[in-house]
Protein backbone atom coordinates (compact mmCIF):
# COMPACT_ATOMS: atom_id res chain seq x y z
CA UNK A 1 0.00 0.00 0.00
CA UNK A 2 1.35 3.43 -0.90
CA UNK A 3 1.02 6.46 1.40
CA UNK A 4 1.37 10.17 0.70
CA UNK A 5 3.45 12.36 2.99
CA UNK A 6 4.56 16.00 3.09
CA UNK A 7 8.21 16.82 3.76
CA UNK A 8 9.64 20.22 4.39
CA UNK A 9 12.43 20.79 1.79
CA UNK A 10 14.18 24.14 1.61
CA UNK A 11 11.30 25.80 3.38
CA UNK A 12 8.76 24.54 0.84
CA UNK A 13 6.31 21.68 0.67
CA UNK A 14 6.87 18.80 -1.74
CA UNK A 15 4.52 15.92 -2.26
CA UNK A 16 6.18 12.52 -2.37
CA UNK A 17 5.24 8.92 -2.13
CA UNK A 18 6.27 6.90 0.90
CA UNK A 19 6.62 3.13 0.94
CA UNK A 20 6.63 1.78 4.54
CA UNK A 21 7.88 -1.62 3.40
CA UNK A 22 10.92 -0.18 1.69
CA UNK A 23 11.78 1.97 4.69
CA UNK A 24 13.47 -0.45 7.05
CA UNK A 25 16.53 1.31 8.39
CA UNK A 26 14.89 4.65 9.19
CA UNK A 27 11.87 5.69 11.20
CA UNK A 28 9.01 6.85 8.98
CA UNK A 29 7.80 10.38 9.41
CA UNK A 30 4.13 9.57 9.21
CA UNK A 31 3.25 6.42 11.05
CA UNK A 32 -0.14 5.69 12.44
CA UNK A 33 -0.07 4.77 16.13
CA UNK A 34 -0.05 1.04 16.69
CA UNK A 35 -1.81 1.21 20.03
CA UNK A 36 -4.89 3.03 21.23
CA UNK A 37 -5.13 4.82 24.54
CA UNK A 38 -7.16 2.77 26.97
CA UNK A 39 -9.55 4.21 29.50
CA UNK A 40 -10.49 2.16 32.57
CA UNK A 41 -13.99 2.58 33.89
CA UNK A 42 -15.27 0.76 36.97
CA UNK A 43 -17.58 -1.98 35.87
CA UNK A 44 -20.16 -3.53 38.15
CA UNK A 45 -19.77 -6.77 36.21
CA UNK A 46 -16.04 -7.26 36.88
CA UNK A 47 -16.06 -7.43 40.66
CA UNK A 48 -19.03 -7.40 42.93
CA UNK A 49 -18.81 -7.36 46.74
CA UNK A 50 -20.29 -10.39 48.37
CA UNK A 51 -23.34 -9.62 50.49
CA UNK A 52 -23.28 -10.55 54.14
CA UNK A 53 -26.50 -12.12 55.31
CA UNK A 54 -27.77 -12.34 58.84
CA UNK A 55 -28.46 -16.02 58.27
CA UNK A 56 -25.14 -17.09 56.85
CA UNK A 57 -26.24 -20.61 56.02
CA UNK A 58 -28.13 -19.17 53.06
CA UNK A 59 -26.18 -18.01 50.02
CA UNK A 60 -27.27 -15.32 47.59
CA UNK A 61 -28.87 -17.96 45.39
CA UNK A 62 -30.85 -19.49 48.20
CA UNK A 63 -34.37 -18.83 49.29
CA UNK A 64 -35.38 -15.20 49.27
CA UNK A 65 -36.69 -15.50 52.81
CA UNK A 66 -33.23 -14.71 54.19
CA UNK A 67 -33.37 -11.26 52.60
CA UNK A 68 -36.09 -10.36 55.09
CA UNK A 69 -33.40 -10.01 57.75
CA UNK A 70 -30.89 -7.17 57.77
CA UNK A 71 -27.23 -7.76 57.03
CA UNK A 72 -24.65 -8.09 59.75
CA UNK A 73 -22.34 -5.09 59.97
CA UNK A 74 -19.24 -4.61 62.12
CA UNK A 75 -20.10 -2.99 65.45
CA UNK A 76 -19.20 0.64 65.97
CA UNK A 77 -16.49 1.20 68.56
CA UNK A 78 -18.43 4.01 70.23
CA UNK A 79 -21.89 5.44 69.81
CA UNK A 80 -22.25 8.43 72.13
CA UNK A 81 -18.76 9.99 72.18
CA UNK A 82 -15.45 9.60 70.36
CA UNK A 83 -13.75 8.74 73.66
CA UNK A 84 -14.79 5.16 74.61
CA UNK A 85 -14.60 5.84 78.35
CA UNK A 86 -16.76 8.94 78.13
CA UNK A 87 -19.14 7.11 75.81
CA UNK A 88 -19.56 4.29 78.33
CA UNK A 89 -20.20 6.77 81.14
CA UNK A 90 -22.95 8.34 79.04
CA UNK A 91 -24.35 4.89 78.19
CA UNK A 92 -24.41 3.91 81.86
CA UNK A 93 -26.23 7.10 82.79
CA UNK A 94 -28.80 6.69 80.02
CA UNK A 95 -29.39 3.02 80.83
CA UNK A 96 -29.76 3.82 84.51
CA UNK A 97 -32.28 6.57 83.86
CA UNK A 98 -34.32 4.32 81.56
CA UNK A 99 -34.33 1.40 84.02
CA UNK A 100 -35.15 3.66 86.98
CA UNK A 101 -37.98 5.29 85.04
CA UNK A 102 -39.64 1.95 84.41
CA UNK A 103 -39.15 0.89 88.03
CA UNK A 104 -40.79 4.11 89.20
CA UNK A 105 -43.61 3.58 86.75
CA UNK A 106 -44.46 0.16 88.13
CA UNK A 107 -44.04 1.38 91.68
CA UNK A 108 -46.72 3.96 90.95
CA UNK A 109 -49.01 1.37 89.39
CA UNK A 110 -48.57 -0.80 92.47
CA UNK A 111 -49.19 2.12 94.82
CA UNK A 112 -52.37 3.09 92.96
CA UNK A 113 -53.50 -0.55 92.63
CA UNK A 114 -53.91 -0.19 88.87
CA UNK A 115 -53.01 -3.85 88.43
CA UNK A 116 -53.30 -6.90 90.57
CA UNK A 117 -50.19 -7.16 92.75
CA UNK A 118 -49.11 -10.43 91.15
CA UNK A 119 -49.61 -9.04 87.66
CA UNK A 120 -47.73 -5.86 88.55
CA UNK A 121 -44.84 -7.92 89.89
CA UNK A 122 -44.66 -9.96 86.70
CA UNK A 123 -44.77 -6.84 84.53
CA UNK A 124 -41.68 -5.63 86.39
CA UNK A 125 -40.18 -9.08 85.97
CA UNK A 126 -40.74 -9.09 82.20
CA UNK A 127 -39.79 -5.53 81.34
CA UNK A 128 -36.69 -4.57 83.34
CA UNK A 129 -34.30 -7.22 82.02
CA UNK A 130 -35.45 -6.83 78.42
CA UNK A 131 -35.16 -3.04 78.59
CA UNK A 132 -31.66 -3.45 79.97
CA UNK A 133 -30.70 -5.51 76.90
CA UNK A 134 -32.15 -2.86 74.60
CA UNK A 135 -29.59 -0.41 76.01
CA UNK A 136 -26.61 -2.71 75.46
CA UNK A 137 -25.65 -1.32 72.00
CA UNK A 138 -25.07 2.09 73.59
CA UNK A 139 -21.86 0.79 75.17
CA UNK A 140 -18.51 0.73 73.41
CA UNK A 141 -16.61 -2.30 72.19
CA UNK A 142 -13.93 -1.92 74.87
CA UNK A 143 -13.37 -4.76 77.33
CA UNK A 144 -14.52 -2.66 80.26
CA UNK A 145 -17.90 -1.88 78.68
CA UNK A 146 -19.58 -4.95 80.14
CA UNK A 147 -18.61 -3.85 83.65
CA UNK A 148 -20.13 -0.44 83.07
CA UNK A 149 -23.32 -2.10 81.86
CA UNK A 150 -23.35 -4.46 84.85
CA UNK A 151 -23.45 -1.48 87.20
CA UNK A 152 -27.17 -1.02 86.48
CA UNK A 153 -28.39 -4.44 87.67
CA UNK A 154 -25.52 -4.52 90.17
CA UNK A 155 -26.96 -1.52 91.98
CA UNK A 156 -30.25 -3.41 92.20
CA UNK A 157 -28.44 -6.27 93.94
CA UNK A 158 -27.37 -3.81 96.60
CA UNK A 159 -30.91 -2.39 96.83
CA UNK A 160 -32.44 -5.84 97.24
CA UNK A 161 -29.97 -6.62 100.02
CA UNK A 162 -30.46 -3.46 102.05
CA UNK A 163 -34.26 -3.54 101.67
CA UNK A 164 -34.53 -7.29 102.20
CA UNK A 165 -32.40 -7.11 105.34
CA UNK A 166 -34.53 -4.31 106.73
CA UNK A 167 -31.73 -1.75 106.63
CA UNK A 168 -33.69 0.47 104.27
CA UNK A 169 -37.47 0.76 104.09
CA UNK A 170 -39.02 1.10 100.64
CA UNK A 171 -42.68 0.09 100.63
CA UNK A 172 -43.13 0.89 96.95
CA UNK A 173 -40.33 -1.47 95.93
CA UNK A 174 -41.56 -4.20 98.27
CA UNK A 175 -45.10 -3.94 96.96
CA UNK A 176 -44.05 -4.00 93.30
CA UNK A 177 -41.60 -6.92 93.61
CA UNK A 178 -42.90 -9.22 96.35
CA UNK A 179 -45.67 -11.81 96.31
CA UNK A 180 -47.11 -11.17 99.75
CA UNK A 181 -45.75 -7.75 100.71
CA UNK A 182 -42.95 -9.13 102.90
CA UNK A 183 -39.69 -7.21 102.48
CA UNK A 184 -37.69 -10.39 103.16
CA UNK A 185 -38.95 -11.83 99.87
CA UNK A 186 -36.55 -9.50 98.09
CA UNK A 187 -33.68 -11.69 99.29
CA UNK A 188 -34.90 -14.53 97.08
CA UNK A 189 -36.50 -14.07 93.65
CA UNK A 190 -35.73 -10.37 93.07
CA UNK A 191 -32.15 -10.83 94.30
CA UNK A 192 -31.61 -13.86 92.03
CA UNK A 193 -33.12 -11.90 89.16
CA UNK A 194 -30.72 -8.95 89.55
CA UNK A 195 -27.75 -11.27 90.09
CA UNK A 196 -28.54 -13.25 86.93
CA UNK A 197 -28.63 -10.17 84.72
CA UNK A 198 -25.47 -8.77 86.33
CA UNK A 199 -23.48 -11.97 85.82
CA UNK A 200 -24.84 -12.43 82.29
CA UNK A 201 -23.61 -8.94 81.41
CA UNK A 202 -20.15 -9.49 82.87
CA UNK A 203 -19.50 -13.06 81.74
CA UNK A 204 -21.36 -13.35 78.42
CA UNK A 205 -22.28 -9.79 77.52
CA UNK A 206 -23.99 -9.00 74.20
CA UNK A 207 -21.67 -11.13 72.05
CA UNK A 208 -22.95 -14.47 73.33
CA UNK A 209 -26.29 -16.14 72.55
CA UNK A 210 -26.13 -17.70 76.02
CA UNK A 211 -26.75 -14.29 77.57
CA UNK A 212 -29.74 -13.79 75.28
CA UNK A 213 -31.20 -17.18 76.15
CA UNK A 214 -30.72 -16.75 79.90
CA UNK A 215 -32.26 -13.27 80.14
CA UNK A 216 -35.09 -13.87 77.65
CA UNK A 217 -36.21 -17.12 79.29
CA UNK A 218 -35.94 -15.55 82.73
CA UNK A 219 -37.81 -12.35 81.86
CA UNK A 220 -40.23 -13.07 79.04
CA UNK A 221 -40.51 -16.83 79.50
CA UNK A 222 -40.98 -17.09 83.25
CA UNK A 223 -43.06 -13.91 83.33
CA UNK A 224 -45.53 -15.08 80.70
CA UNK A 225 -45.74 -18.53 82.27
CA UNK A 226 -47.20 -17.01 85.43
CA UNK A 227 -49.54 -14.59 83.65
CA UNK A 228 -50.95 -17.15 81.20
CA UNK A 229 -50.94 -19.97 83.74
CA UNK A 230 -53.13 -18.02 86.15
CA UNK A 231 -55.68 -17.18 83.48
CA UNK A 232 -55.70 -20.22 81.22
CA UNK A 233 -54.09 -22.85 83.39
CA UNK A 234 -57.10 -25.02 84.03
CA UNK A 235 -55.39 -28.26 83.07
CA UNK A 236 -52.54 -28.99 85.45
CA UNK A 237 -49.39 -30.95 84.73
CA UNK A 238 -49.67 -34.46 86.25
CA UNK A 239 -46.30 -34.39 88.02
CA UNK A 240 -46.78 -30.86 89.43
CA UNK A 241 -50.26 -29.59 90.27
CA UNK A 242 -48.90 -26.09 90.81
CA UNK A 243 -48.03 -25.80 87.10
CA UNK A 244 -50.23 -25.92 84.02
CA UNK A 245 -49.76 -26.93 80.40
CA UNK A 246 -50.83 -23.46 79.27
CA UNK A 247 -48.22 -21.78 81.45
CA UNK A 248 -45.40 -24.07 80.30
CA UNK A 249 -46.33 -23.64 76.64
CA UNK A 250 -46.51 -19.87 77.09
CA UNK A 251 -43.11 -19.88 78.75
CA UNK A 252 -41.41 -21.85 75.98
CA UNK A 253 -43.08 -19.73 73.30
CA UNK A 254 -42.34 -16.35 74.88
CA UNK A 255 -38.75 -17.27 75.73
CA UNK A 256 -38.09 -18.57 72.22
CA UNK A 257 -39.67 -15.66 70.33
CA UNK A 258 -37.96 -13.08 72.51
CA UNK A 259 -34.61 -14.82 72.03
CA UNK A 260 -35.09 -14.68 68.26
CA UNK A 261 -35.99 -11.00 68.48
CA UNK A 262 -32.83 -10.16 70.41
CA UNK A 263 -30.73 -12.35 68.14
CA UNK A 264 -31.88 -10.20 65.23
CA UNK A 265 -31.43 -7.03 67.31
CA UNK A 266 -27.82 -7.73 68.28
CA UNK A 267 -27.03 -9.12 64.82
CA UNK A 268 -28.10 -5.84 63.26
CA UNK A 269 -25.38 -4.13 65.31
CA UNK A 270 -22.80 -6.80 64.44
CA UNK A 271 -22.39 -8.20 67.96
CA UNK A 272 -23.37 -11.76 67.07
CA UNK A 273 -23.97 -13.66 63.85
CA UNK A 274 -27.42 -15.14 63.52
CA UNK A 275 -28.11 -18.46 61.84
CA UNK A 276 -30.90 -20.99 61.50
CA UNK A 277 -28.85 -23.32 63.66
CA UNK A 278 -28.97 -20.69 66.38
CA UNK A 279 -32.74 -20.40 65.96
CA UNK A 280 -33.08 -24.13 66.54
CA UNK A 281 -30.76 -23.87 69.53
CA UNK A 282 -32.90 -21.15 71.10
CA UNK A 283 -35.97 -23.32 70.59
CA UNK A 284 -34.39 -26.29 72.36
CA UNK A 285 -33.14 -24.12 75.22
CA UNK A 286 -36.60 -22.63 75.75
CA UNK A 287 -38.31 -26.04 75.68
CA UNK A 288 -35.87 -27.60 78.15
CA UNK A 289 -36.04 -24.55 80.41
CA UNK A 290 -39.84 -24.62 80.40
CA UNK A 291 -39.76 -28.31 81.30
CA UNK A 292 -37.36 -27.73 84.22
CA UNK A 293 -39.52 -24.82 85.39
CA UNK A 294 -42.51 -27.16 85.52
CA UNK A 295 -40.74 -29.62 87.84
CA UNK A 296 -41.52 -29.56 91.59
CA UNK A 297 -37.88 -28.83 92.41
CA UNK A 298 -38.13 -25.53 90.55
CA UNK A 299 -40.98 -24.48 92.82
CA UNK A 300 -39.10 -25.51 95.94
CA UNK A 301 -36.00 -23.56 94.96
CA UNK A 302 -36.93 -20.49 92.93
CA UNK A 303 -37.81 -19.96 89.28
CA UNK A 304 -35.46 -16.99 89.15
CA UNK A 305 -32.64 -19.37 90.02
CA UNK A 306 -33.48 -22.56 88.12
CA UNK A 307 -34.57 -20.88 84.87
CA UNK A 308 -31.34 -18.94 84.13
CA UNK A 309 -29.14 -21.79 85.37
CA UNK A 310 -30.90 -24.22 83.03
CA UNK A 311 -30.68 -21.78 80.12
CA UNK A 312 -26.96 -21.26 80.69
CA UNK A 313 -26.24 -24.97 81.10
CA UNK A 314 -28.21 -26.08 78.03
CA UNK A 315 -27.09 -23.06 76.04
CA UNK A 316 -23.44 -23.83 76.75
CA UNK A 317 -23.95 -27.22 75.14
CA UNK A 318 -25.99 -26.43 72.04
CA UNK A 319 -25.61 -22.71 71.29
From Swiss-Prot:
GO terms for molecular function: kinase activity; phytol kinase activity. Its main location: plastid. It is found in: Plastid, Chloroplast membrane. Its EC number is 2.7.1.182. This is Probable phytol kinase 3, chloroplastic. Pathway: Cofactor biosynthesis; tocopherol biosynthesis. One of its GO terms (cellular component) is chloroplast membrane. Keywords: Chloroplast, Kinase, Membrane, Plastid, Transferase, Transit peptide, Transmembrane, Transmembrane helix. It catalyses: phytol + CTP = phytyl phosphate + CDP + H(+). Involved in the activation and reutilization of phytol from chlorophyll degradation in plant metabolism, including tocopherol biosynthesis. Catalyzes the conversion of phytol to phytol monophosphate (PMP). The chain crosses the membrane at residues 83-103, 123-143, 147-167, 185-205, 252-272, 278-298. Belongs to the polyprenol kinase family. GO terms for biological process: vitamin E biosynthetic process. It is a multi-pass membrane protein. Residues 1-22 form a transit peptide. Signal peptide: none annotated.
Amino acid sequence: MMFLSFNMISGGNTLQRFDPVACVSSVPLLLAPTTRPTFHFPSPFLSKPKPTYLFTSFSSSSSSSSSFFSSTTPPRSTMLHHDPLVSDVYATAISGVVALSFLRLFQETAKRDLFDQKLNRKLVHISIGLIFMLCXPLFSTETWASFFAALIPGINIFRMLVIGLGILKDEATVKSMSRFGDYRELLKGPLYYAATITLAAIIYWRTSPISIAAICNLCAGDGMADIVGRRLGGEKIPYNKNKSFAGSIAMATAGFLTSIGYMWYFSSFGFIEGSWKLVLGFLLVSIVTAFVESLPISTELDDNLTVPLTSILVGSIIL
